[in-house]
Structure formats: C-alpha cells, structure tokens
Amino acid sequence: LADTHIRLLHDYLDSHECFPTVAIEGGVCYFRWDKDCIDKCKFISHSNGVVNVTERYLSENSSGIVIRDAGSLSILEKTKSEDNFSKLVSPRNLFKVEIEKLREQEKENGIKVFGRYNRGRGNQFLDNYITKDIRAERFLGKWKVFVSKADGAAGQLGNPIPARIIGKAELGDPFTICTETFLAVGPFNSRQETVNVMKYFTTKFFRFLVGVRKLK
C-alpha cells in the first residue's frame, strides 16, 4: 500500500465485467507500475457500469487496506477522532476452552461456555475456569457480547442480494465465556450497556464501517 510507483489501477467489483464466465469473489483489479513516477495513483473503479475516477494514495486514511469505494473516504476521515471500536474486540480464542472438559449438564457454581454444538448455537458447561491470561481475566464476571469470528459476506457486497455483513450477536452474562468460534466484545459493567452495543451492531453506520473492510 505504501508503493507510490503504482500510477494506474483499474478495480472491478464484479469479476464478470472482465471474465463473463468466471466468478471471482472480491472482484478483479489490474495496475500499471511506473519506476520513474512517485505520485498518487489514478484509481478507476468499475461498478455496475458506473466508472468513478479518483487520484489518491492507496494507503489513504491509514486504514491498512485499500478503500475501494472512494465515497467512503470522507466518512472514514470523520471517524478518526473517535476511539476505535476494535479496542473492545477480543483476540481469537480468548478463553482457550478445553473442549474435552465440557459437559452438557450444568453443575452448581459452574461456568457456561457459549459455542456451536451439534450444528447449532448453545451452552455447555465447565466445572470451573481458571486463566492466567490478563485479557481473558478482564471479561470474567463482566457482561459481554459474543459474535462469530467468521460470518457474514465477503468480497462483493449487495450483489446479487443484500449481504449479511455480520453474524447475529449474542448476549453474554458475567458467568459465561465462549469457545474459539466466537469473539467477545467488552467487557461491560451492566446488562443495559451490553444491550446498547448489540443495538449498535444493527445500525446502518456500523454495518457500513464493517462492510468497507469486507469490500477490500
């Protein structure tokens, strides 16, 4: 992304515009690299017959990805001054649950473990849970939101049908952790605060921000 020798880039969100008989998820792009030129890239986006041309650096707004939709850049620029929501999102496999120790019946003072079991979402149980991971400890005894680490659409969004941007969020009470299938968002001090975050997940603005990263 930091290469300023890429002088021209054509980006096709729908691969069929280049290869009518081939479906390539995420689309197709090609570019011209010029060793004698150090400047902005002429970025030409092709989408549903509409061509949009901008002059910009590929690393525009320091997001770590190429923002394919030029119209999104100004919106993203306005969010820079706000705290990044990703600070609330746990790393993968935060709790490092030992699956072989799970049981289907709940034991008094046990710990619920939210995950996917028998092709569906649900809870199983641990007799106890101890961790030395400071990141995991922060979530113990606190409210949190569970969201699938791999869900929703990827690549080309909204074509041919509106894409599911992110999977359904689940409320996690202070006595519940999750398997590696899910990420934990939080921690939060109250149920109401957690519910508010779940509502934020459903807003068009949040879906837009996540969608921009998926459309990379």
Protein language model annotation of sequence segments:
Residues 15-216:
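C-terminal substrate-recognition regions of SAM-dependent nucleic acid methyltransferases
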Residues 5-17:
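Conserved S-adenosyl-L-methionine
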Residues 4-5, 38:
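Conserved small helical "lid"/interfacial subdomain of P-loop NTPases
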